[in-house]
Curated annotation (Swiss-Prot):
GO terms for biological process: translation. The gene is rpsP. This is Small ribosomal subunit protein bS16. PANTHER family: 30S RIBOSOMAL PROTEIN S16, SMALL RIBOSOMAL SUBUNIT PROTEIN BS16M. Keywords: Ribonucleoprotein, Ribosomal protein. It comes from Staphylococcus carnosus (strain TM300). Pfam families: Ribosomal_S16. One of its GO terms (molecular function) is structural constituent of ribosome.
Length: 92
């Protein structure tokens, strides 16, 4: 089973809110998920953190072979999770 880390869309029209989830690559965008690992709010104007990710879960799924989509890859890079993953992978 090919597993991807991707976004599912919530929120209303012109006010998106996304969950960062682990899902089967063949399931629809807002379809069945395996596990939720975080959230992303691109229109948050309050100055708070737009991204919340459970770093341990993200690293676990990356280690197990889940492939992030391009957008999630950028988010994980910005949060420093991919750097941690690369360090763990190359330290062995």
């Amino acid at each position: 089973m090919a597993v991807k880390i991707r976004l599912t869309r919530l929120g209303s029209k012109r006010n998106p809110f996304y969950r960062i989830v682990v899902a089967d690559a063949r399931s629809p965008r807002d379809g069945r998920i395996i596990e939720q690992i975080g959230t992303y709010n691109p229109v948050d104007n309050s100055g708070e953190n737009k991204v919340t990710i459970d770093e341990e879960l993200a690293l676990k799924w990356l280690k197990d072979g889940a492939k992030p989509t391009d957008t999630v890859h950028n988010i994980l890079s910005r949060e420093g999770i991919l750097k941690t993953f690369d360090e763990q992978r190359h330290s062995k």
